[in-house]
Swiss-Prot record:
Residues that coordinate or bind Ca(2+) 1: 31, 33, 35, 37, 42
GO BP terms: cellular response to hypoxia
A molecular-function term among this protein's GO annotations: calcium ion binding
Name of this protein: Calcium-binding protein CML39
Stretches assigned to the EF-hand domain: 18-53, 54-89, 93-128, 129-159
Source domain of life: Eukaryota
Classification of source organism: Eukaryota, Viridiplantae, Streptophyta, Embryophyta, Tracheophyta
Length: 159
């Protein structure tokens, strides 16, 4: 269970360190059915979107870890508790992992994440998203409003 929390922490904590709005954005993205709660299945699918594998048992354990009210789901406060585990990576390791993730989402010959490359990667991961969905996802972190994510923008999003 500690390994599951560490895995969740390393993948999602980078997303959430900047501001509370990042937490809300990640939560909203993971809450696929928009009911204000994240189920173990939604957690597992979102994890897969980030290029990580999570078993049904790990997803259930992760939800139970922070499910304060015992409803089998995570509200935004419980989700915040889940991801606040110890982040044991050095800055160099964090940057390397972020670069590895970034490379997964860029098309050959490109140096940025485009709506098309994001859509393609999500399809490979079993997530069906429209190009418009991908544009919205990119827009949330596109600091210079050029319609794509540079490595620096991606790194800020992941921290």
């Amino acid at each position: 269970m500690k390994n599951t929390q560490r895995q969740l922490s390393s993948s999602f904590m980078k997303f959430l360190e900047e501001k509370n709005r990042d937490l809300e954005a990640v939560f909203a993205y993971m809450d696929a059915n928009r009911d204000g709660r994240i189920s173990a299945e939604e957690l597992k699918k979102s994890f897969k979107t980030l290029g990580e594998q999570m078993s049904d048992e790990e997803a259930e354990a992760a939800v139970k870890l922070s499910d304060i009210d015992g409803d089998g789901m995570l509200d935004i406060n419980e989700f915040a508790l889940l991801i606040k585990g110890n982040d044991e990576f050095t800055e160099e390791e964090k940057k390397r992992k972020i670069m590895e993730a970034f490379r997964m989402y860029i098309a050959d010959g490109e140096d940025c994440i485009t709506p098309g490359s994001l859509k393609m990667m999500l399809m490979k991961l079993g997530e069906s998203r429209t190009t418009d969905d991908c544009k919205v996802m990119i827009q949330a972190f596109d600091l210079n409003a050029d319609g794509v994510l540079s490595f620096d923008e991606f790194a800020l999003m992941m921290r």
